[in-house]
C-alpha cells in the first residue's frame, strides 16, 4: 500500500507544473512634490506604462496634495490618470495626508492624517477605494489596526 502511495505521489510531483507570477517593483516618489515626485513627466509616464501593460497592477504611495500640483502643471496627464485610478490596475496604499511617522504622534493626529488624506484623494479621484495599507516601519503604531478598520481597510 505504501508503495502505491509513493508511486501516486511521485506521479503528482512529476506532473505538477509549478508556476509563479512575475513580480514587478516600482520605486519611489512617495515624498510628493516636496520629496521626489517629478511633476513634469512622471504622471504621463505612469499612465503610458499602464496603458502599454494592461496586466500590470501598481500601488501608489504618493502624498495626496501632490495631485493639486499635477492637476495644474500637467492637466492632460492628470485627466488620463483620473480614468486609470478607478480601474483594478491602481491602488492607493497610503492615503495619509503627509505620510507621517505614526510611532511618535497620537491616535487623534493619525486619524486626522487619514481623514484629510482620504478626503483629498477622493476630491481628485472619486470612486477610489482603500483596501491595503502598506508603508515603511516608522509609519506603524499600536493603534493602527483599529484606525484602519475604522476607515474600511481590509
Language-model regions, residue ranges each:
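Sec-dependent N-terminal signal peptides
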Residues: 4-16
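Carbohydrate-active enzymes and regulators
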Residues: 19-154
Amino acid at each position: 500500500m505504501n508503495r502505491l502511495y509513493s508511486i501516486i505521489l511521485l506521479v503528482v510531483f512529476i506532473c505538477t507544473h509549478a508556476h509563479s507570477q512575475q513580480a514587478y517593483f516600482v520605486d519611489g516618489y512617495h515624498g510628493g512634490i516636496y520629496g521626489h515626485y517629478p511633476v513634469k513627466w512622471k504622471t504621463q509616464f505612469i499612465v503610458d506604462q499602464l496603458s502599454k501593460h494592461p496586466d500590470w497592477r501598481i500601488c501608489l504611495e504618493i502624498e495626496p496634495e501632490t495631485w493639486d500640483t499635477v492637476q495644474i502643471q500637467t492637466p492632460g496627464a492628470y485627466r488620463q490618470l483620473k480614468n486609470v485610478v478607478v480601474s483594478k490596475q491602481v491602488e492607493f496604499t497610503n492615503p495619509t495626508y503627509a505620510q507621517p511617522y505614526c510611532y511618535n504622534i497620537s491616535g487623534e493626529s493619525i486619524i486626522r492624517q487619514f481623514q484629510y488624506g482620504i478626503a483629498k484623494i477622493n476630491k481628485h479621484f472619486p470612486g477610489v477605494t482603500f483596501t491595503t495599507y502598506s508603508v515603511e516601519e516608522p509609519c506603524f503604531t499600536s493603534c493602527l489596526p483599529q484606525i484602519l478598520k475604522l476607515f474600511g481597510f481590509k
